[in-house]
Amino acid sequence: MAHCVTLVQLSISCDHLIDKDIGSKSDPLCVLLQDVGGGSWAELGRTERVRNCSSPEFSKTLQLEYRFETVQKLRFGIYDIDNKTPELRDDDFLGGAECSLGQIVSSQVLTLPLMLKPGKPAGRGTITVSAQELKDNRVVTMEVEARNLDKKDFLGKSDPFLEFFRQGDGKWHLVYRSEVIKNNLNPTWKRFSVPVQHFCGGNPSTPIQVQCSDYDSDGSHDLIGTFHTSLAQLQAVPAEFECIHPEKQQKKKSYKNSGTIRVKICRVETEYSFLDYVMGGCQINFTVGVDFTGSNGDPSSPDSLHYLSPTGVNEYLMALWSVGSVVQDYDSDKLFPAFGFGAQVPPDWQVSHEFALNFNPSNPYCAGIQGIVDAYRQALPQVRLYGPTNFAPIINHVARFAAQAAHQGTASQYFMLLLLTDGAVTDVEATREAVVRASNLPMSVIIVGVGGADFEAMEQLDADGGPLHTRSGQAAARDIVQFVPYRRFQNAPREALAQTVLAEVPTQLVSYFRAQGWAPLKPLPPSAKDPAQAPQA
């Protein structure tokens, strides 16, 4: 499971703080806390104190891990520091604000009003937070060939492969090993990419040793030759190096080399991350499809999967809240289309496989996750559960919007469809066709199985064992479906379902935009204060 975990740093500033000091302005400091569950908050860090300032811009950034698949609730507290003790209880509280880390990274720059307590603003005070990913996302891409390598095998030519080592801590560290090319003294190895940080520690002058060896199946590989270089020298393509065998060089005065290594391509490129796209303004458009087929059971019966408990919930709603609460932070307008399928709908009672939950086909958008919940509760008594379980219509519906977004040729939108269903899909072939077509578009499909039915067909759509194929043999361009049965998480922490089904989304989004060659949109520059007016701590 490829969780999206990376380190981000938060830059913080405030405006119009209330003054607690008599005869002067406050001396503010910001403390950052994270919700760790059970009503507890853990402190992650503090900025420096800025003296005598009501609109501080803190120079010390605060770092924390970012996880896409989790709602990371944060609390910022601003305090007027008038002593040297680390305790905050004896300092004046100037206001606080709460948000999620997802809101910060998707907003690029987030400004919130400071509150002294719920419902009581801290005057005109505001806090502004921006995030930056702490990551060297450069990769070095190379293509290398050799000429006239020494023959090492008695009954054939050599089976050469390359190894690249980085110098550090007085040792040589292996950073890349190529494939073996059998029986060839003039090989060209496959193009490869290595993170710059791993390849040379980020320093293009770091010594690099390259070894060319003859492969032996018992592990006793024979050295053909070696040379020393650096990333800076490798980039001077076409670069050519003599492959030297130290022992042969010492023994034979006439020794020249054991072949030459030629670097055909060596370039440093930026490999964009999920956060690069999100912080560049990419919107994640969230759509929900709910199964209203007869196999769910009569909603008025406590045995029905659609039965609403005395607290107004069921498995469908709990799954929706779990996933939706994470995704909603990445959609600026928080208007989500929501559909039902497999029911007879009024007024003509025809079976529909993509009816708007709010019964407004021209505007199926619901305001936030709560809006979807409200529409679902209102639709439930107005439809007749029927069948069959067809996924293709809703997948194709979302795919049409994804295709329009793709036509723009920018990394501005990505679509996520959440299907909540109680049983096996009926239109298997049509769904396969829809998923394979959608794999070429900026979208992902998440299926949550509700109830205890046999979900084997869903596992096939997940395609973790290999690419999904249509009946005609067309393969999916990438894996875009993630399926999980809800009951596997029934007794797990509430956030466990979202962590599992959303773990692959960052990789799916990045793989799509990378395949198209689309860089992130340029993020909006944070509003900067005049450095000449910045107070000193």
UniProtKB/Swiss-Prot annotation:
Binding site for Ca(2+) 4: D153, D214, D216, D222
Induction annotation: Up-regulated by the inflammatory cytokine TNF-alpha. Up-regulated during neuronal progenitor cell differentiation.
SMART domains according to UniProt: C2, VWA
Iron keyword on record: no
Assigned GO CC terms: azurophil granule membrane; cytoplasm; cytosol; extracellular exosome; membrane; nuclear membrane; nucleoplasm; nucleus
Domain C2: 1-114, 123-245
Keywords: Acetylation, Calcium, Cell membrane, Cytoplasm, Differentiation, Membrane, Metal-binding, Nucleus, Repeat, Repressor, Transcription, Transcription regulation
Domain VWFA, chain residue ranges per copy: 285-505
Co-factor(s): Ca(2+)
Location in the cell: Nucleus; Cytoplasm; Cell membrane
GO biological process, one term: proteolysis
Tissue expression per record: Expressed in neutrophils (at protein level). Widely expressed. Expressed in the brain. Expressed in neutrophil precursors from bone marrow and peripheral blood.
Chief place of localization: nucleus
Xref: CDD domains: C2A_Copine, C2B_Copine, vWA_copine_like
UniProt keyword RNA-binding, yes or no: no
InterPro entries: C2_dom, C2_domain_sf, C2B_Copine, Copine, Copine_C, VWF_A, vWFA_dom_sf
Residues binding Ca(2+) 1, per UniProt: D21, D27, D80, D82
A Pfam family recorded for this sequence: Copine
Job of this protein: Calcium-dependent phospholipid-binding protein that plays a role in calcium-mediated intracellular processes. Involved in the TNF-alpha receptor signaling pathway in a calcium-dependent manner. Exhibits calcium-dependent phospholipid binding properties. Plays a role in neuronal progenitor cell differentiation; induces neurite outgrowth via a AKT-dependent signaling cascade and calcium-independent manner. May recruit target proteins to the cell membrane in a calcium-dependent manner. May function in membrane trafficking.
Subunit-structure text: Homodimer; homodimerizes via its C2 domains. Interacts with p65/RELA (via N-terminus); this interaction induces proteolytic cleavage of p65/RELA subunit and inhibition of NF-kappa-B transcriptional activity. Interacts (via VWFA domain) with ACTB, CCDC22, MYCBP2, PPP5C, RDX and UBE2O.
Domain notes: C2 domains are necessary for calcium-dependent cell membrane association. C2 domains are necessary for neuronal progenitor cell differentiation in a calcium-independent manner.
Protein name as it appears in the record: Copine-1
Organism: Homo sapiens (Human)
Gene that this sequence comes from: CPNE1
